[in-house]
Design a protein with these regions (language model features):
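Extended C-terminal regions of large enzymes
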Residues: 3-185, 387, 391-394
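Short Cys/His-based metal-binding microdomains
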Residues: 25, 177-229, 307
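Active-site metal-binding core of divalent-cation-utilizing nuclease and nuclease-like domains
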Residues: 179-180, 234-309
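C-terminal, well-structured subdomains that either form a transmembrane helix-short loop-helix hairpin
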Residues: 188, 295-301, 308-316, 331-334
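Short beta-strand-loop-alpha-helix junction that forms the active-site gateway
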Residues: 294, 306, 311-326, 352-354
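Metal-dependent nuclease catalytic cores in nucleic-acid-processing enzymes
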Residues: 328-343
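Domain-level recognition of nuclease-like catalytic cores that cleave nucleotide substrates
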Residues: 345-407
């Protein structure tokens, strides 16, 4: 892929970074295998093997007895501390298997897992020493896992852009100033040309409509997914209304599972109309409220007096939560006025990072409209791909003052 040599190898093997690549560390696998062998001998049911004092030689790569001893100590300490919460988890969200009450096989697996966790901690510590390459650890977005099949299908240019943009290794003016001691600025506005500035913060690029162009491409992809689900729900409602089950003598009626059909916001009606603010001046219907705000998408059912307002933002990944709060507060008054007028109003503020990392709000939105499992995963993959390609085009255009590559 011709990645720069300054890219740390820990970025390829880390399991906690926001971009998880399908590679594993040979040293980590070697240490885990040696630890498994040693624990197998130490915890053997055969007393002769257990008391034989078999030594597992790991060479200069690892000190297996010390690592196994430290792993056991960690497991005992965790048993004394209890089950701590991680992130925004509530009480009782996770259960921990205790080392003292586990079987021999479970103890062996727990020790190997602890050895791997220690290696991951060392990688994270080393990555935090690099302020640019470790910045993605602070992003409030779900982890994105890249598989071997994705690497085979993706173009080399898009794959290199994804990896370099996540770890901030693109030759931006700010990086050139740090690498080569130059004094370059953003070509369009003359400010510091960091990657976040180029992809989502340049005011001149905003006035030229470059960010709007990327925004519309992502919005069209979301609108296509919403329209497909609206059509699917309408067909299901029609089939459910006309289907008659005939039961023969001696047989029982088969229960039909409509769980997914009832637990989404689009299953209550079949006259939904999807309108997108692309090339038109979209406005909220006046019978709901009178406002000058123009949402990105509205989903209206006049028979049931329901409306869904979708507001999309494509910010930098470290500003996703701030952007979501601003959008929700922006339309809160409209939601209150609509409810006073007898309408059921739902506000969806969704975000997709400029590098192609959909936020949690996007996953929640797709779940609300009826996407589950593989279908939701497919939509998220398409959104990531569209955003990556658009941001790659913006990155190329940042070297020129016009889209055509002139000037």
């Amino acid at each position: 892929m011709k990645l720069p040599k300054s890219l740390s190898s820990h970025c390829f093997y880390s399991k906690t970074t926001k971009l998880r690549l399908p590679y594993s560390s040979l040293i980590e696998d070697f240490k885990a295998a040696k630890a498994r062998n040693l624990v197998t001998f130490q915890e053997s049911r055969d007393e002769c093997i257990k008391n034989a004092g078999i030594v597992v030689d790991a060479g200069t790569k690892a000190n297996t007895p010390a690592e196994v001893k430290e792993a056991k100590s960690r497991l005992r300490v965790q048993e004394l501390v209890g089950v701590p919460n991680k992130g925004k988890e509530g009480l009782g969200m996770r259960k921990r298997q205790y080392y003292s009450s586990s079987s021999t096989k479970q103890k062996r697996d727990m020790i190997v897992k602890t050895v791997r966790e220690k290696e991951e901690e060392c990688r994270v510590v080393k990555m935090t020493n690099f302020p640019n390459q470790g910045a993605n650890l602070r992003w409030e977005v779900p982890q994105r896992q890249v598989k071997h099949n994705d690497i085979i299908k993706a173009s080399d240019e898009r794959l290199k852009f994804l990896i370099k943009s996540v770890y901030d290794l693109l030759p931006t003016p700010a990086n050139k100033n740090r690498w080569f001691n130059t004094e370059e600025k953003c070509l369009l506005c003359g400010l510091d040309g960091t990657l976040a500035h180029i992809l989502s913060g340049c005011k001149v690029a905003l006035c030229l409509g470059r960010y709007k162009w990327r925004h519309d491409r992502v919005l069209k992809e979301i609108a296509g997914a919403v329209q497909a689900k609206v059509t699917e729900n309408a067909n299901k409602a029609e089939n459910r209304r006309t289907r008659i089950q005939f039961v023969k003598e001696g047989q029982q009626r088969k229960e039909v599972n409509h769980e997914e059909e009832h637990f989404n916001h689009l299953s209550d009606a079949k006259d939904w109309k999807v309108t997108v603010d692309v090339g038109t001046s979209l406005k909220i219907p006046t019978e709901i409220c009178i406002t000058n705000l123009r949402p990105d998408m509205i989903i209206v059912s006049r028979k049931t007096k329901q409306i869904g307002i979708v507001e999309l933002t494509v910010p930098n990944e470290d500003r996703i939560e701030v952007s979501g709060e601003l959008k929700r507060s922006k339309y809160e008054q409209i939601a209150q006025e609509g409810r006073l007028n007898g309408w059921r109003v739902k506000i969806w503020a969704v975000e997709v990072g400029c590098r192609g990392f959909p936020a949690v709000s996007m996953s929640a939105f797709l779940k609300d409209i009826g996407y589950r499992g593989a279908s939701k995963k497919k939509v998220i993959e398409n959104l990531s791909k569209v955003t990556e390609e658009a941001s790659l085009s913006l990155w190329k255009a940042s070297h020129y003052k016009e889209w055509g590559g002139k000037g």
